[in-house]
Amino acid sequence: MNIDIEHQPDKAQLESLGVFNWPIWEKEASTFPWTYYEEEICYILQGKAVVTPEGGPSVEIGAGDLVTFGADLRCMWHIVEPIRKHYRL
């Protein structure tokens, strides 16, 4: 499993990463499989999801979390509340 979550990073850190200039992705409540072929960093603006990596424990992510998904990660997304996030590959 390679999911790192930083809860409530400070604004200076987000600005230094350029988070607010990254594209935005939105998705309604749903469940679907996903594979990360390369590392992705995202900042959750709103919503909540449970992500279950193949062979690992589930993690909950939500508004205010900075999340890094490792390359070659296979997982199942269960979006509990419609999600909106900035992301960078």
Regions found by a protein language model. Name each.
Residues 34, 51, 85-87:
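Short hydrophobic/aromatic-rich beta-strand segments that constitute the beta-sheet cores
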